[in-house]
Amino acid sequence: MPDDFKIPRATLKRLPLYYRFVSILKGKGIDRVNSKTISEALQIDSATIRRDFSYFGELGKKGYGYNIDSMLEFFKSELSESDQIKIAIIGIGNLGRALLTYNFSIHDEMTITEAFDIRPDIIGENIGDVVVKHSDDIKTTLESEDIDVVILTTPDNVAQQVADELVKAGVKGILNFTPRRIKTPQDVQVHHIDFGIELQSLLFFMKNYSK
């Protein structure tokens, strides 16, 4: 595969699903898995899985299945260059508090280590072993802690302003839970999470594809 080859974006979006499933299999002591098993578990067409995995190199052989350890090693290298991903969250309202309390409890490699808000009554509060700091400290903290991934759960009217500050602080990835479609430079990746759209999509598939 050429050095400048890039895995398609659609395939990249499925990587975390594959990674989670394969990690579960590893925990059960399973050392190989075939595309049919993955397809049934994740509800992804087998042909799509085989095409996705064709981009990943020699992870298995036809009729023999994919090697779990090789898959885990590949997924880790693609999802992160380090074993531990430090994440910051900005906006500790109801959703922010819930995410901070959950704090990726089933993902050992990802941890929210910094939290920010502007409300005086919440600054200094310890939530899930993370102390909430004032938003004025965002740039200094992110730079000193080398954090380049942020979860954004602020009110939508300040989302773009906060995003601009994050870009200045060197952030390269934003998971945006606000309704605002924020704009960033091309080298900053933004994934928008809209619960309303996700529910509409779910209802559509229930209506049109349920047996």
Swiss-Prot record:
UniProt GO MF annotations: DNA binding; DNA-binding transcription factor activity
Residue ranges the record marks as coiled coil: none
Gene3D superfamilies, alphabetized: NAD(P)-binding Rossmann-like Domain (3.40.50.720), Winged helix-like DNA-binding domain superfamily/Winged helix DNA-binding domain (1.10.10.10)
Localization annotation: Cytoplasm
Record InterPro entries: CoA-bd (IPR003781), NAD(P)-bd_dom_sf (IPR036291), Rex_DNA-bd_C_dom (IPR009718), Tscrpt_rep_Rex (IPR022876), WH-like_DNA-bd_sf (IPR036388), WH_DNA-bd_sf (IPR036390)
Annotated binding of NAD(+), by residue: G91, I92, G93, N94, L95, G96
Keywords, sorted A to Z: Cytoplasm, DNA-binding, NAD, Repressor, Transcription, Transcription regulation
Subcellular location, principal: cytoplasm
Regions crossing the membrane: none
A single BP term in Gene Ontology: response to redox state
Any one cellular-component term (Gene Ontology): cytoplasm
DNA-binding region per Swiss-Prot/TrEMBL record: 17-56
General function of this protein: Modulates transcription in response to changes in cellular NADH/NAD(+) redox state.
Subunit structure comment from the entry: Homodimer.
Homology family: Belongs to the transcriptional regulatory Rex family.
Protein name as annotated: Redox-sensing transcriptional repressor Rex
Taxonomic lineage from the root: Bacteria, Bacillati, Bacillota, Bacilli, Bacillales
